[in-house]
Regions:
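Broad hydrophobic/π-residue packing in well-ordered secondary structure
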Residues: 24, 41, 45, 165-171, ...
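Short, low-complexity, Pro/Ser/Thr/Gly-rich segments in the mature regions of secreted, periplasmic
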Residues: 213-232
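Amphipathic, coiled-coil-like alpha-helical scaffolding segments used for oligomerization/assembly
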Residues: 95-98
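Alpha-helical assembly-interface signal, strongest on the long, hydrophobic N-terminal helix that forms
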Residues: 2-90, 107-109
């Protein structure tokens, strides 16, 4: 019996029929992990690109808005800015959910006529994320510096304005946050206002029925357009 057991043991040790299956079982977790990590990294890169494009489109669109009068500088209205803000939500789509997962800050960088310094004339914000502008708040005097990262600041010319947009967004993992470091995506963009703009204020089209103002003390998620066309 002892000899029979040894014979069977030797036969088992020489048997190679299950090697491939064992190797597959051992290697599959590593291959699966690598595949999921690659998918997460690719999705993160795509979302990063999308947020960057949204920042550019917001700044570009906000620099173009206004009425079409040829007799005076173009006025801009709260409804114009609401359209720009809602347009970014539509462009981002449900996958991004821009205002539920992030925050947009639109600033009008101008030159103070009295001090000749750069200052933020007005800001409009939207989004649930608790984030304040990294470059200043409404009414802040910026001296001669302007807005933007150190040594890369943009400045406005006298009588003109620069629309500066910041987006701070929390990435929503496709698989798991453990595959990534920080989930925060930050993007900025700026465009000089295209036409001669009335820089005195942002107007209401109908003062008796004013449109919502997206002030930066509010933290509101994705916008909803009602059946009568009103914007919340």
């Amino acid at each position: 019996m002892h000899v029979s057991f040894l014979t069977r043991l030797h036969a088992l040790l020489r048997n190679r029929s299950g090697v491939a299956m064992v190797e597959f079982a051992l290697g599959t977790p590593f291959l699966l992990t690598a595949g999921l990590w690659g998918a997460e990294e690719a999705n993160y890169a795509l979302v990063n690109l999308k947020i960057s494009q949204l920042a550019e489109h917001l700044a570009d669109n906000a620099s173009r808005i206004g009425d079409t009068s040829t007799l005076q500088n173009r006025r801009i209205y709260e409804s114009d800015l609401n359209d720009v803000i809602f347009g970014a939500q539509v462009q981002g789509g449900r996958k991004i959910n821009l205002y539920d997962n992030g925050r947009v800050i639109i600033s009008s960088l101008e030159v103070n006529s009295a001090s000749k310094n750069q200052y933020i004339h007005w800001q409009r914000c939207r989004g649930l994320k608790a984030y304040d502008s990294a470059y200043g708040i409404q009414g802040q005097d910026l001296g001669a510096v302007g807005m933007g990262p150190t040594s890369e600041e943009v400045t406005a010319e006298p009588g003109d304005a620069v629309i500066f947009v910041e987006i701070n967004y929390t990435y929503q993992p496709l698989v798991s946050a453990k595959f990534l470091g920080s989930l925060d995506i930050h993007s900025i963009a700026s465009f000089t206002v295209r036409d001669s703009r009335d820089l005195s204020q942002i107007y209401q089209r109908n003062p008796n029925s004013p449109d919502p103002v997206q002030t930066c003390n509010k933290y509101t998620g994705n916008a909803v357009i009602s059946t009568n066309g009103s914007f919340n």
